């Protein structure tokens, strides 16, 4: 390719076809074993071929690919092509959402999700983007609450516009083995959402008096839910659990590890969906432990939290062990080098960074997580933004605080990829 501009002697139609292929490679995970994995955007390629290569869904895929590669390669020509496609799609999507008589179908939902991902890719420190508008549009089409919890409940209820047949009536984060008491991860996450809302009501408003009985009951409920998650993790079958493939020693060349090189174990998984499910469960436990410690400090400032802090270090360490799997193209080659080069030589597919984005950000914001681990996670987010072409990762890495609904809408859009 020239420094910037279209490749010589290649027609626009072929450039768009290549962009479509790039999207399928970069963002779609087709499950090899459907007993273990739901995949990610796994039904999108057949859908595009059914609807046509110039359909709105196909053009939304191209817009995402042009934007992502334009950012990674510093090619304004590519980002401009993505921008043109994006704006062409906006009008038709808005009309479909505003006019129920047109009959919103699965293709409209998918287009809204993809345009939301486009906004997340194009976001940056000075331009947070408008992905929340597309999350709101998707929620309006599905007639659900505009939140990850609303989407989770729709998947569990078998919403008619949920595309991935493996998810309908089964939930979103399904594993071969239920947890303790037969609870699925989805069930536990719904309870966690309710618990979070209750804790925000009690603890976020200094004008509301705190009563011992309410705080004690909330801590007991939080502790019980943490136990449920422990049981869920222990109940999983060996073929669903991570497998250790290597170990990274501390680098003699760096005071603090670069992205992917936290010293310790390196794990592999069935696929990125399974890795994502595990990290959702881990960060959920970190959130619960953070709340337990916070409540305990109010109820009894002298209480000992050492075991909880050890648990958090172990959970975050397990997330770190999954990061090379998410971020590298060839995990075997990465491990074989054993940190000889303290930089990831061959970045993996952007979908790995996308699935990792929100669990890592949540963990990086929890006071119970040690500062050195928080700093490492911010490095990983910045790396995802730079080398995987997901601009919102840079914003999450550097913004001192991200507005709650902005974050929730991004999480909702990423989770929506499990439904397609």
Swiss-Prot record:
Induction: Deletion of the conserved eukaryotic csnE deneddylase subunit of the COP9 signalosome leading to defect in protein degradation results in the activation of the silenced dba gene cluster. Expression is positively regulated by the dba cluster specific transcription factor dbaA. Expression is also controlled by the transcription factor flbB. Transmembrane segments: none annotated. It is found in: Nucleus. The keyword Transcription regulation applies. Disruption phenotype: Reduces the amounts of DHMBA produced and strongly reduces the production of yellow pigmentation. Keywords: Nucleus, Transcription, Transcription regulation. The keyword Transcription applies. InterPro entries: DHMBA_Reg_Transcription_Factor. Its main location: nucleus. GO terms for cellular component: nucleus. Transcription factor that coregulates the expression of the gene cluster that mediates the biosynthesis of the antibiotic 2,4- dihydroxy-3-methyl-6-(2-oxopropyl)benzaldehyde (DHMBA) and its derivatives. Specifically positively regulates the expression of the FAD-dependent oxidoreductase dbaF. This is Transcription factor dbaG. It comes from Emericella nidulans (strain FGSC A4 / ATCC 38163 / CBS 112.46 / NRRL 194 / M139). The gene is dbaG.
